Structures are given as C-alpha cells and as structure tokens.
Design a protein with these regions (language model features):
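Phenylalanine-focused residue identity feature
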Residues: 23, 29, 36, 52, ...
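Hydrophobic beta-strand residues in large extracellular and virion-surface proteins
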Residues: 8, 48, 65, 78, ...
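A short, well-structured beta->alpha microelement
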Residues: 50-64, 83-87
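Catalytic cores of nucleic-acid endonucleases
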Residues: 73-126
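Active-site beta-strand-loop-beta-strand hairpin of nuclease catalytic cores
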Residues: 60-77
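Non-catalytic C-terminal interaction segments of nucleic acid-processing enzymes
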Residues: 1-7, 121-131
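Acidic-basic catalytic patches of nuclease active cores, encompassing PD-(D/E)XK
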Residues: 2-56
Length: 131
C-alpha cells in the first residue's frame, strides 16, 4: 500500500505542478485530481463512476469517484478536497470495501493536519504538496 501511495502522490503532484500559474486554485486542483483518478481507475480495468452518492447516506453524502468491476461491485473509492471533511469520511465509511482514499491538496498544512482528526483507520489519506 505504501508503494502505491508514494507512486500516486508523485504522479498527482507532477500533474498539479503542470497547471499554469494563473489557473492554480482549488476548483482546478480538485477537477484535475478527479480527471487523473478517472484515467487511473480505467487503466485498472474498472469502470470509473464520478460523483457517486452512497445509497445509505441520507444527508447527501458523496464520493468524488468510485471504480466498479464487471460485476458492478465497487472496488475503490476516492474523496478529494482541500482538507479532510467529516462528510467525506462518513460517505466512504458507508461503503464496504478495502480501497478508500481521501486526497487533500490545501497549501495550509496546519489545517490539513488538524482535519485528519476525522480519519478512520480504514481510510488512506494522501496529502499533495504544492510547489
């Protein structure tokens, strides 16, 4: 898992670094990460489904992207945001699968660190550094 995490971190950070300076802001980072994950999930022979709403979530939870196999079983799920949000953690916890990821991209390291309080042991957290 750690090698996948470091590989994914390096690839995503390189992708974000390519964004021209005038366009480097939250929504662009968010969508760029989602687009990258979409391609990665598709390359893994899974069908990427963006903006998934877990069926058991009544409060409007959402997950940015899931990967579904040929039997329609969810194999991986990703939530993306500047910091770890409780809503994202609850949405991921509603799914019964091993590969659950929260990817954060805020430049405010202290806020990201404070927000990891919400994380559960079953969720991988990946923070992307921006240069």
């Amino acid at each position: 898992m750690e090698s996948l995490k470091s590989t994914l971190k390096g690839a995503l950070e390189a992708e974000l670094a390519r964004i021209p300076q005038p366009f480097r802001h939250g929504p662009v980072f968010h969508q760029t990460i989602k687009c990258f994950l979409y391609g990665m999930v598709k390359e893994a022979d899974l069908w990427p489904i963006p903006d998934f709403k877990p069926p058991r979530m009544r409060d409007g939870g959402f997950i940015d992207l899931i990967g579904v196999d040929s039997s329609n079983a969810v194999k991986c799920a990703f939530a993306v945001g500047p910091v770890v949000e409780l809503k994202a953690v609850k949405s991921l916890e509603a799914l019964d699968l091993e590969e659950k990821w929260i990817i954060t991209f805020s430049t405010l390291a202290k806020k990201v660190k404070e927000s990891t309080f919400f994380l559960k042991p079953t969720i991988e957290h990946l923070h992307l550094e921006q240069k």
